[in-house]
């Protein structure tokens, strides 16, 4: 029972809500049915909307109910009957994955989505994903999601909604489809009373080899209005206490939620036609037919439901006129009035064809004659499956009638439903509401033609006795003497009513409209500060959906590489609003530019590079702003100019392939059809160029928002070759724990691109030089383009290009060769027995199952079959490199080799300078692993390296080579590295099942976006180098990064000695560093360290033993939640056959005492140190070996004594 004080509190709260005009809603948190999954947060934490196919809405206003699948499936369940089901999944970065390589939310392989995998059955299969029960969708409810599928062999995708006994098909498609950036689905559910469920199904044939995936489901404006104690001024108060805007009364939709806004008592003076029983007062001239969806669908573009009943059994009008023929519907005659507006609300449907057109005319009756029709509305194109609401207010001094004209394009349909005349639309006296007669002319075409000098085909422009075809309109080249063919092609100051050809194609509550500045209020003047001036302004529209406003140009192109759009814009909005420019090509949108966070309200000049594009493409302004929000929110565009777009105009820089990017980008320009782009940037922060360290370079960040798509292109203008061979040299930068692939290719007209060079994964935080020989066909008509492509098969890191140079003649031999793209100029000798191959099919010549570079069957290597039938015993097969330049100092030539299990013979390495000298000889049985070989090279003249395979006469034997590299400095001992010249024999190992992240290589002095030690251990300065890994990129899920040694021979006892560094803030969860021994018997963790550590280098010694060949693996991982900080390694030393020696404690600098507590703490630490040493001495007497020790590096304050002791199994270590 509620006490008087309780009643008083409730009364006070109720009165406060009354006085403030705010929502007053009882708390329904404990109601399991009525207040759950209805798109309204009844609980303060919105817990009543959890697991409803979405999660509770954000506290930020105007945000949708969303499920991005990052936490869980949000209640979506698989109800498929076959063995293949929808699952919440996450992709790796591997290109051989059947599903998407990234999600849509994050755009990386760390994100989650719902997917159904490969179907290998003999019959077509349908997989269905169903939502939980949802309740009460508003008429404005819109479901948006992103989908991905392999378009080659998926039969159909469907989105259905089931309520009561009826299932509505909201959307269905048989393609085409594309990757994440290309396909967003937005469907309007319409008003749904009571409970309903949504299902997404994919039907695939028996040969489908790819995955179907869904991500980022959003429910926009689905909740019914909540009861209000008092409505804003002018709003209608519904019977259920909800509030709706005045224009929502009698509009044919249940906006209140209880249909009181459509009460016949309120709407009795409106003339509404829903076509359920006929045409009402409207008259069909030709082309329209009344129909419904159930059992009548003649194509997928046919309306699946009407608007009035939101049912497949509801009636509507649809145009059945042949393409090119206009269907006309006209109203009865209404009285004219200058004192009020006659409002006409209507719903139309345009779907299936870009050639669909709909127009609304008003035809007035003068004193003696009927006046020509006046066009009030015109829409064309593909608007999706929604019924779009619009409204016109007609004020006429003379009687008038309304004409509705529709023309369908190929495969498309135009529909009409719910034609509603307001109470101010009064019939002419004596005119029946059931029928009327048409007097006067009607439009026989949607676009009435003026008199022309010459008849041209449809779509052609007549000028100067010419018929300009569509592909030459807006191609940035003037064909007409007066330039009529380029008049409405995007360039405009909006002073002309044609608006430069920009056309609003919005379907929601916002629209683009040419407006006069002094009337718009936001802003009050145009760009030229003229109050009477015009600009393209974002305004309110009569649509019911909260969709973006869109304005589109006519078809443009082709354009040249220097094509730019210049404009001024105004943008002021809350954080959820945006203003953007996109390019539409072949149904896909590429985001070119987005306005930064809300400006101060003034006009801003902006230049946007469009670049070289093929015909046809269109430009589109897209914006979403809450015009009713606080402040002067709004968006506007003015003075749009397309400059330097003629593709036939060339400049001197177009032939400049050599470029340091200091002045401009020379002949290089960015490619398109992806939201990821190369940018010419100036050195700043962690990004620096190669030329000066402070200049410009080309930069690609695969995570740079809104980067999406498979990759980014950087290519030259077409070039004319002048010599048969040229050498292209360039500097590249690949850095990051999971950076993708950088490729170089040559493109010739009419031919497939030829891959010339590629690198994958991190190459350390430094610039590397590479060169490639270009082979040309010297024919006058043969031109070529060079193109770099940065592939987004990795998402953490950056790519850079700088200092391109082209010279006549061939290049020197490459310093690095992975054989992924070519044979790198290696010559197989007279017999040609060395071949480049991979084992992807499993049916190729004899050789390793996987390569060393990628660790996959798709990777390439060089191999020679040493079987006696091809290479008799004692015979040799040589593989010779191109010439290397003279060496100014000693260098290390390293390579990875693979010998077949049975002894294939001897692999010898020679260096050919003025004479030929043998540097290395390898023989014996092989195995299943790639092994590292290395030789020290000194050469004062040009030299070559020769690999020679001498056969032993064993059947089914081979020798293989991969990853040949030349680095400055002498070669390191096996398992050892000071990291001053690179990673030595240590390399990235893929983490099982998830691809992997790479350890990186850097110095403290080199700028980097990732935290790392400020100095190394080897030299103790910022110029020294080390290996490191940034743990923050791992994310949850137990992933790790592995750095593995070369295979090491079996050992009874050996000592591993290294220095490590951890830099984790104390308030973060910590990462872990582990040492694993990996062999064919499995993996064994022999040491680990985690937790917060002070930023310092610590020493570790571990004694290891193994009865078979093994690898040492350093694993960087997380103990739980994501950590923020680096783990680093330096001075790794593997002492084969030696016991570890107790390290001498380092003498760090002694800090002067600053306070009594510090002195007391120091004494206590000294006591603990002596106690620890005494304990160690006692352990020594007990004959227990010290298997692992830590010590602090010289030059660092060792405030805490750090020691780790690991007791290893006897199978791994042995007592001294």
Curated annotation (Swiss-Prot):
Glycosylated residues (UniProt): 205, 291, 341, 368, 639, 839
Function: Probably involved in the sorting and selective transport of receptors and ligands across polarized epithelia.
Pfam family membership, one: Ldl_recept_a
Membrane topology (UniProt): Single-pass type I membrane protein
Entry keyword set: Disulfide bond, Glycoprotein, Membrane, Protein transport, Repeat, Signal, Transmembrane, Transmembrane helix, Transport
PROSITE patterns: LDLRA_1 (PS01209), LDLRA_2 (PS50068), MAM_2 (PS50060)
Compartments it resides in: Membrane
Domain MAM: residue ranges: 62-224, 268-427, 492-647, 654-813, 812-973, 972-1142
Signal peptide segment: 1-21
Cytoplasmic compartment spans: 1177-1216
Transmembrane segments: 1156-1176
CDD domains, per the entry: LDLa (cd00112), MAM (cd06263)
Protein's name in the database: Apical endosomal glycoprotein
Extracellular-side positions: 22-1155
Domain LDL-receptor class A intervals: 27-54, 229-269, 454-491
GO biological process: protein transport
A GO cellular-component term linked to this record: endosome
S-S pairs: 231-243, 238-256, 250-267, 456-467, 463-480, 474-489
Tissue: Apical endosomal tubules of developing rat intestinal epithelial cells.
């Amino acid at each position: 029972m509620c006490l008087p004080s309780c009643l008083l509190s409730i009364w006070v709260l109720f009165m406060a809500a009354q006085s403030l005009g705010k929502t007053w809603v009882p708390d329904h948190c404990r109601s399991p049915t009525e207040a759950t999954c209805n798109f309204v947060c009844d609980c303060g934490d919105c817990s009543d909307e959890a697991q409803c196919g979405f999660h509770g809405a954000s506290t930020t206003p105007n945000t949708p109910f969303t499920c991005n699948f990052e936490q869980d499936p949000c209640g979506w369940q698989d109800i498929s009957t076959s063995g293949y089901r929808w699952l919440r999944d996450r992709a790796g970065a591997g290109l051989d994955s059947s599903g998407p390589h990234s999600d849509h939310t994050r755009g990386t392989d760390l994100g989650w989505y719902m997917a159904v995998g490969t179907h290998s059955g003999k019959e077509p299969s349908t997989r269905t994903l169903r939502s939980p029960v949802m309740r009460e969708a508003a008429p404005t409810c819109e479901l948006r999601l992103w989908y991905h599928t392999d378009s080659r062999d998926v039969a159909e995708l469907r989105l259905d909604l089931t309520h009561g006994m009826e299932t509505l098909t909201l959307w269905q498609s048989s393609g085409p489809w594309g990757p994440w950036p290309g396909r967003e689905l937005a469907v309007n559910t319409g008003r749904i009373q009571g409970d309903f469920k949504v299902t997404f199904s994919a039907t695939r044939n028996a040969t489908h080899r790819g995955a179907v995936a869904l991500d980022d489901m959003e429910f926009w404006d689905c909740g019914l209005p909540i009861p209000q104690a008092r409505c804003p001024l002018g709003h209608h108060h519904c019977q259920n206490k909800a509030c709706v805007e005045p224009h929502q009364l009698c509009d044919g939709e249940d906006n209140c939620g209880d249909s009181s806004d459509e009460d016949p008592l309120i709407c009795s003076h409106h003339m509404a036609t829903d076509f359920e029983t006929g045409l009402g007062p409207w008259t069909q001239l030709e082309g329209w037919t009344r129909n419904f969806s159930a059992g009548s669908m003649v194509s997928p573009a046919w309306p699946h439901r009407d608007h009035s009943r939101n049912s497949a059994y509801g009636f509507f009008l649809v145009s059945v006129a042949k393409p090119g023929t206009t269907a006309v519907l006209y109203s009865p005659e209404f009285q004219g009035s200058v004192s009020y507006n006659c409002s006409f609300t209507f719903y139309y449907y345009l779907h299936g064809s870009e050639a669909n057109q709909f127009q609304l005319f008003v035809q007035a009756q003068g004193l003696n004659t009927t006046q020509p029709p006046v066009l009030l509305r015109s829409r064309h194109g593909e608007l999706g499956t929604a019924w779009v609401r619009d409204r016109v207010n007609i004020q006429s001094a003379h009687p008038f009638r309304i004409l509705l004209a529709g023309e369908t394009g190929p495969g498309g349909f135009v529909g009409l439903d719910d034609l509603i005349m307001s109470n101010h639309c009064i019939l002419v006296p004596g005119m029946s509401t059931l029928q009327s007669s048409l007097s006067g002319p009607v439009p026989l075409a949607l676009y009435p033609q003026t008199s022309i000098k010459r008849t041209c085909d449809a779509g052609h422009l007549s000028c100067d006795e010419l018929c300009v075809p569509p592909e030459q309109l807006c191609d940035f080249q003037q064909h007409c003497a007066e330039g009529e063919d380029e008049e409405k092609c995007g360039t405009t100051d909006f002073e002309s009513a044609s608006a430069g050809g920009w056309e609003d194609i919005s379907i929601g509550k916002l629209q683009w409209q040419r407006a006069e500045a002094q009337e718009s209020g936001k802003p009050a003047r145009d760009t030229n500060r003229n109050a009477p001036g015009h600009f393209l302004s974002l305004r309110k529209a009569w649509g019911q959906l909260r969709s973006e406003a869109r304005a589109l140009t006519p078809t443009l192109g082709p354009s040249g590489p220097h094509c730019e759009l210049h404009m001024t814009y105004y943008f002021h909005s809350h954080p959820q609003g945006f203003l953007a420019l996109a390019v539409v090509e072949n149904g896909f949108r590429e985001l070119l530019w987005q306005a930064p966070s809300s400006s101060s309200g003034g006009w801003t000049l902006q230049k946007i590079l469009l670049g070289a594009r093929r015909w046809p493409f269109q430009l589109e302004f897209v914006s979403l702003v809450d015009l009713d929000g606080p402040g002067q929110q709004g968006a506007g565009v003015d003075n749009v100019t397309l400059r330097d777009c003629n593709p036939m105009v060339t400049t001197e820089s177009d032939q400049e392939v050599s470029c340091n990017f200091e002045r401009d980008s020379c002949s290089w320009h960015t490619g398109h059809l992806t939201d990821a782009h190369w940018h010419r940037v100036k050195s700043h922060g962690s990004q620096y160029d190669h030329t000066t360290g402070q200049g410009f370079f080309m930069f690609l960040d695969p995570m740079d928002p809104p980067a999406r798509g498979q990759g980014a292109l950087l290519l030259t203008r077409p070039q004319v070759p002048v010599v048969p061979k040229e050498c292209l040299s360039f500097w590249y930068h690949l850095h990051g724990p999971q950076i993708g692939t950088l490729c170089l290719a040559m493109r010739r007209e009419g031919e497939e691109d030829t891959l010339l060079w590629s690198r994958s994964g991190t190459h350390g935080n430094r610039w590397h030089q590479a060169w490639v020989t270009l082979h040309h066909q010297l024919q006058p008509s043969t031109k070529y383009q060079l193109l770099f492509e940065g592939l987004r098969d990795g998402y953490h890191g950056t790519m850079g290009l700088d200092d391109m140079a082209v010279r006549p003649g061939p290049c020197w031999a490459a310093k690095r060769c992975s054989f992924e793209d070519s044979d790198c100029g290696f010559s197989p000798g007279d017999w040609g027995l060395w071949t480049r191959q991979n084992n992807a099919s499993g049916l190729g010549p004899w050789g390793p199952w996987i390569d060393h570079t990628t660790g996959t069957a798709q990777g390439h290597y060089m191999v020679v079959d040493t079987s006696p039938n091809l290479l008799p015993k004692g015979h040799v097969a040589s593989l010779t490199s191109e010439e290397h330049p003279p060496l100014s100092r000693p260098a290390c030539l390293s390579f990875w080799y693979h010998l077949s299990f049975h002894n294939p013979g001897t692999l010898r390495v020679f260096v050919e300078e003025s004479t030929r000298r043998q540097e290395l000889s390898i023989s014996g049985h092989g195995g299943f692993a790639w092994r590292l070989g290395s030789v020290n090279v000194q050469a004062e003249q040009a030299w070559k390296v020769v690999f020679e395979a001498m056969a032993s006469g064993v059947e089914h034997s081979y020798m293989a080579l991969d990853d040949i590299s030349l680095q400055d400095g002498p070669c390191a001992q096996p398992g050892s590295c000071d990291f001053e010249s690179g990673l030595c024999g240590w390399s990235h190992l893929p983490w099982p099942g998830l691809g992997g992240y790479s350890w990186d290589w850097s110095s403290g002095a080199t700028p980097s976006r990732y935290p790392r030690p400020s100095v190394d251990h080897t030299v103790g300065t910022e110029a020294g180098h080390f290996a490191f890994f940034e743990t923050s990129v791992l994310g949850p899920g137990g992933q790790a990064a592995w750095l593995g040694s070369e295979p090491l021979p079996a050992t009874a006892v050996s000592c591993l000695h290294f220095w490590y560094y951890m830099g984790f803030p104390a308030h973060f969860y910590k990462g872990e560093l582990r040492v694993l021994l990996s062999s064919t018997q499995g993996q064994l963790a022999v040491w680990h360290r985690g937790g917060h550590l002070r930023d310092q280098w610590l020493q570790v010694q571990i004694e290891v033993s193994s009865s078979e060949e093994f690898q040492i693996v350093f694993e960087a991982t997380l103990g739980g939640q994501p950590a923020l900080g680096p783990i680093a390694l330096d001075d790794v030393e593997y002492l084969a056959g030696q016991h570890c020696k107790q390290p001498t404690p380092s003498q760090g600098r002694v800090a002067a005492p600053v306070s009594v507590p510090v002195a007391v703490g120091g004494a206590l630490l000294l006591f603990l140190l002596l106690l620890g040493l005494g304990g160690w001495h006692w352990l020594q007497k007990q004959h227990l070996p010290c298997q692992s020790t830590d010590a602090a590096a010289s030059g660092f304050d060792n405030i805490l004594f750090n020691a780790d002791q690991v007791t290893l199994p006897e199978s791994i270590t042995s007592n001294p």
